[in-house]
Amino acid sequence: MANLIVVCGPQAVGKMTVAESLRDKLRYNMMMNHDSIELSDRIFGFATPAQREYNAVIREKAFELAVKHHVDLIFTYVCAFDIPEERDYLMKLKDQFKDGGGEFYFVELSADLETRLARNETPHRMERKASKRDVAWSRENLLKDAEKYRLNSAEGEYWFEHHLKIDNTNLDPDEVADRVIAAFHLTAREKTEKEYRFGV
């Protein structure tokens, strides 16, 4: 069996750093949404039809193999809660891992816009995400999406049995990870470092 933890929230809310902390505390493997985005962008260009299709193929195969080979996974994702297809996609992921005998956990992060704009320009973010190094474009994209989409759920809106909401405006990643682990009663796996964080 394989568990999936989806760390969700708007751009620059802190998904990557929280996921990294969860990875190190739980010894789960990790796939950022930008892992597949950056690769498909390099090959097919930004937001082209081929890029979108290849990005989806990479993710689908990763989830398939995680379930097949019993690899616990953390996945970061930006969700537009006002688009029905987003819920359909996440429900499909939930069913995929539950049908394989695992569990599905949904962690939703939120932070105020000022905090997100500051986090958008951190050196760690620039290092890990090549597409964010054009700071002016990245800032404009963040502001545009904040205006266009509902990137956090409404008060009292819960999509999943295991759906945890955390405002991490004033929390560091380790504090958030500890809350997630406690809320879902998660335990660390027995893995060597090379099995879950090779090359990072």
Question: Each PLM stretch: what is its role?
Answer:
Residues 11:
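The conserved Walker
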